């Protein structure tokens, strides 16, 4: 059974993945927000390289990087810039250094659709076609810039080491899908359903891919992003889209 470590796993995406991946994998969650440690949930500051070296098990097979902090401005002040850089870039680099040192096979990086949000408006592509990972990444804010930077850092690790790096540009994953769909029209196109989230990350864990970048979205009507390479290269099979979720209300 593969050992899968979820870094920053205390949020919505981490909770969904932990609850479902434990059926097939030995899953551990590390997060700064863990208050009461258990055998499976540990406290760790991923911006501290030495702490990660100490706490991440050397026999890990896959690291999933879900690190996040709240951000809302396209251009941030110096304090916010430094904090965001620590979480969204430095910690990503540190994790890959740890993976290299421990000879961990794979890092799956939770990137974001904001890597290319210049091309998207309210869940619709502005390109008269679906946005692909071959489109030059034009983000509209610092958050997207740092996500792209971490994707590219993953490329140099995959190029110069044995590490496999898979970037998943996640769409929208609300805690309550049906309630969120009623309140936000954009989600009709950008939602990554819980079932598809698990299917996509499971495919990424199992895929024999050295490096790749993929959009994480369900097969929704008018979705803005192309998922054909995730289907072809990872074996992703989306099952539950927003039309189905709405029809079951």
PLM segments and residue spans:
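N-terminal Rossmann NAD(P)H-binding glycine-rich loop of SDR-like oxidoreductase domains
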Residues: 4-23
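NAD(P)H-binding glycine-rich loop region in Rossmannoid oxidoreductase-like domains
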Residues: 46-87
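Alpha-helical substrate-binding/gating segment
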Residues: 170-177, 191-212, 219
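Conserved beta-loop-beta element that borders a ligand/cofactor-binding pocket
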Residues: 111, 151-176
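Conserved C-terminal active-site "lid" loop/helix of NAD(P)H-dependent oxidoreductases
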Residues: 213-237
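Catalytic helix-loop patch of NAD(P)-dependent Rossmann-fold dehydrogenases
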Residues: 86, 122-161
């Amino acid at each position: 059974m593969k050992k899968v470590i979820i870094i920053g796993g205390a949020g919505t995406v981490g909770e969904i993945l932990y609850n479902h991946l434990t059926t097939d994998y030995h899953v551990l969650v590390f997060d700064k927000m863990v208050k009461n440690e258990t055998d499976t949930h540990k406290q760790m500051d991923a911006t501290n390289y030495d702490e990660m070296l100490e706490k991440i098990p050397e026999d890990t097979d896959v690291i999933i990087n879900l690190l996040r902090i709240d951000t809302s401005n396209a251009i941030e002040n110096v304090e916010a810039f430094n904090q965001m850089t620590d979480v969204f870039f430095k910690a990503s680099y540190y994790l890959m250094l740890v993976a290299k040192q421990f000879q961990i096979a794979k890092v799956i990086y939770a990137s974001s659709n904001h890597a290319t949000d210049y091309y998207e408006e309210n869940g619709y592509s502005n390109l008269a076609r679906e946005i692909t990972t071959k489109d030059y990444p034009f983000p509209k804010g610092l958050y997207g810039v740092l996500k792209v930077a971490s994707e590219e850092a993953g490329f140099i690790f995959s190029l110069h080491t044995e590490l496999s790096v898979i970037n998943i540009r996640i769409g929208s994953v609300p805690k309550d899908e049906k309630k969120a769909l009623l309140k936000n029209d954009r989600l009709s196109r950008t939602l990554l359903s819980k079932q598809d989230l698990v299917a996509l990350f499971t495919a990424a864990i199992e895929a024999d891919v050295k490096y790749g970048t993929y959009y994480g979205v369900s097969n929704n009507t008018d979705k803005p992003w192309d998922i054909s390479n995730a289907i072809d290269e990872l074996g992703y099979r989306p099952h539950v889209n927003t039309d189905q979720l709405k029809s079951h209300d």
